[in-house]
């Protein structure tokens, strides 16, 4: 793997659309070549995600069953006890995960809410795991507190292209997201930032999301690509499913535009066949969320993932 390469060119939306339009075999060939230039193609990074505070969120994200605006059958749950978080973190480490992400359904944490999360970060870090948190928007100084506690990564997704964003969320604007990402960078935290596809956006808008992500400077260290999980009770429950090969194309284009980032298969993996996941790995995905639940939606069981890894000859980082 050779990192002595020129800076990554910033591509326009039309240039990214042209990548999407390549013949499938050509796109996969290019993406796999770029992937091999920067990563071992047979190693996958494993992260586990735990909801440390569930439901009751004031935001109106149209895909999210945790919003107070929708009746999606999610029971609100207060912040977990430290002991419960550590129990889950130990189980994740024993199962092979190298990173543990803690997610809270907040618009953003108040200082009194942040304090117990800082303790969670310190204790999970002491287990020898990389730490990640997704807590919503951060105020000035909060990213620095998380960094001091031992946080490695902060997740804050752009979700979709600016042109489609207002169709999905009205309680938080695009600049709010960019401002939080800037605070995270200033605190010298690694950035985990991606989006969701299959929400009814056009291919042009998928290209627009990737263009926005790739334009972040520096580019995110981790890029989670979520496939919409259509949850009954949310506004997007009846959205037409994205074609599997279009999702694979999205992974390949993401790899070409962000060659040094870890590209993670995130939500929606439970509904993918092993063959589709294998194509995603071939296209440059090299990270997954590992464990039977992602916040409030399902995820493949550990045993299924291990069987898939064995059949593909890949191992965990």
Curated annotation (Swiss-Prot):
Enzyme Commission number(s) of this protein: 2.8.1.6
Positions binding [2Fe-2S] cluster in this chain are 101, 132, 192, 264
Q: Which GO biological process annotations does it have?
A: biotin biosynthetic process
Task: Spell out the molecular function terms from Gene Ontology.
Answer: 2 iron, 2 sulfur cluster binding; 4 iron, 4 sulfur cluster binding; biotin synthase activity; iron ion binding
Pathway(s) it belongs to: Cofactor biosynthesis; biotin biosynthesis; biotin from 7,8-diaminononanoate: step 2/2
Assigned keywords, A-Z: 2Fe-2S, 4Fe-4S, Biotin biosynthesis, Iron, Iron-sulfur, Metal-binding, S-adenosyl-L-methionine, Transferase
EC top class, as a word: transferase
Positions annotated to bind [4Fe-4S] cluster? 57, 61, 64
Ranges for domain Radical SAM core: 42-260
Q: Which free-text remark accompanies the cofactor?
A: Binds 1 [4Fe-4S] cluster. The cluster is coordinated with 3 cysteines and an exchangeable S-adenosyl-L-methionine. Binds 1 [2Fe-2S] cluster. The cluster is coordinated with 3 cysteines and 1 arginine.
Name the catalysed reactions: (4R,5S)-dethiobiotin + (sulfur carrier)-SH + 2 reduced [2Fe-2S]-[ferredoxin] + 2 S-adenosyl-L-methionine = (sulfur carrier)-H + biotin + 2 5'-deoxyadenosine + 2 L-methionine + 2 oxidized [2Fe-2S]-[ferredoxin]
> Does the entry feature the keyword S-adenosyl-L-methionine, yes or no?
yes
Superkingdom of this protein's organism: Bacteria
Co-factor(s): [4Fe-4S] cluster; [2Fe-2S] cluster
The record's annotation in InterPro entries points to: Aldolase_TIM (IPR013785), BATS_dom (IPR010722), Biotin_synth/BioAB (IPR002684), Biotin_synthase (IPR024177), Elp3/MiaA/NifB-like_rSAM (IPR006638), rSAM (IPR007197)
Q: Which NCBIfam families does its entry note?
A: bioB
Q: What does this protein do?
A: Catalyzes the conversion of dethiobiotin (DTB) to biotin by the insertion of a sulfur atom into dethiobiotin via a radical-based mechanism.
Oligomeric and partner information = Homodimer.
Recorded family membership: Belongs to the radical SAM superfamily. Biotin synthase family.
Q: What is this protein called?
A: Biotin synthase
Q: Which organism is it from?
A: Thiobacillus denitrificans (strain ATCC 25259 / T1)
Write the gene name.
Answer: bioB
């Amino acid at each position: 793997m050779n990192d002595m390469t020129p800076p990554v060119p910033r591509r326009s939306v039309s240039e990214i659309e042209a990548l999407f339009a390549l013949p499938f075999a050509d796109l996969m060939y290019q993406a796999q070549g770029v992937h091999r230039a920067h990563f071992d193609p047979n190693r996958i990074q494993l992260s586990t995600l735990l909801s440390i505070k569930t439901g009751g969120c004031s935001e109106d994200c149209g895909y999210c069953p945790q919003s107070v605006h929708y009746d999606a059958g999610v029971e609100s749950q207060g912040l977990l006890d430290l002991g419960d978080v550590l129990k889950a973190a130990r189980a994740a480490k024993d199962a092979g995960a190298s990173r543990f992400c803690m997610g809270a359904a907040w618009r953003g944490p108040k200082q009194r809410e942040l304090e117990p999360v800082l303790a969670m970060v310190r204790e999970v870090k002491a287990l020898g795991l990389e730490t990640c948190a997704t807590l919503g928007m951060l105020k000035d100084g909060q990213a620095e507190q998380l960094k001091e506690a031992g946080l490695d990564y902060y997740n804050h997704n752009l979700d979709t292209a600016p042109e489609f964003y207002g169709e999905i969320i009205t309680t938080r604007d695009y600049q709010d997201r960019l401002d939080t990402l800037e605070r995270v960078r200033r605190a010298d935290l690694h950035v985990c930032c991606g989006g969701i596809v299959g929400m009814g956006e056009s291919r042009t808008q998928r290209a627009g999301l990737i263009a926005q992500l790739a334009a972040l400077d520096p580019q995110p260290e981790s890029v989670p690509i979520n496939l919409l999980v259509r949850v009954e009770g949310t506004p997007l429950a009846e959205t037409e499913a994205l074609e599997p090969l279009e999702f694979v194309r999205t992974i390949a284009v993401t790899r070409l535009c962000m060659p040094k980032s870890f590209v993670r298969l995130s939500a929606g993996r439970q509904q993918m066949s092993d063959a589709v996941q294998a194509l995603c790995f071939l296209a440059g995905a090299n990270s997954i969320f590992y464990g039977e639940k992602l916040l409030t939606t399902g995820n493949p069981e550990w045993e299924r993932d291990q069987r898939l890894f064995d059949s593909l000859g890949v191992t965990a980082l």
